[in-house]
Design a protein with these regions (language model features):
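Active-site signature of alpha/beta-hydrolase-fold catalytic machinery across serine-
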Residues: 101-105
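Conserved alpha/beta-hydrolase
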Residues: 38-57
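Short beta-strand-to-loop junctions in surface cap/lid or active-site-entrance loops
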Residues: 1-15
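Gly/Ala-rich beta-loop-alpha elbow adjacent to hydrolase catalytic centers
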Residues: 91-95, 99
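The conserved beta1-alpha1 loop
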Residues: 18-24
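The serine-hydrolase catalytic nucleophile loop
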Residues: 24-35
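Catalytic nucleophile-loop/oxyanion-hole region of alpha/beta-hydrolase
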Residues: 55-83
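Alpha/beta-hydrolase fold nucleophile elbow
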Residues: 83-92
Length: 107
């Protein structure tokens, strides 16, 4: 049986990058970029948005965009609680929308 996607967190240095996946995706969407950044000594965190990466595809339909925005804010808070004063944010597709919102609302 195939395993379900999980958040990706790799702590390396005081430079942190938050990677946000696409709608109906998972941290696997940004795994290659995460590995590249890790090799360059960046700390990388790619959370799993609520309702994504489950055995029941309809779980995603039960969520609202504000839930995913809260997931994004929690991810930023997690990295700041880990001691990172500056967090770079990148997103793919839907994740890109939340990345831009994060940069606009939490510069």
């Amino acid at each position: 049986m195939k395993s379900l996607p999980k958040p990706l967190y790799a702590k390396h240095s005081k430079r942190a990058v938050l990677l946000l996946h696409a709608y109906s995706g998972s941290p696997n969407d940004v795994r290659m970029l995460a590995r590249y950044l890790e090799k360059s000594e960046y700390t990388v965190y790619a959370p799993l948005f609520t309702g994504h990466g489950t055995l029941a595809p309809q779980d995603i339909l039960a969520q609202k965009t504000e839930t995913w925005w809260e997931d994004t804010k929690q991810a930023i808070h997690f990295l700041k609680a880990e001691g990172f004063s500056q967090v770079a944010v990148f997103g793919l597709s839907m994740g890109g929308i939340f990345a831009v919102r994060a940069l606009a609302e939490q510069p």
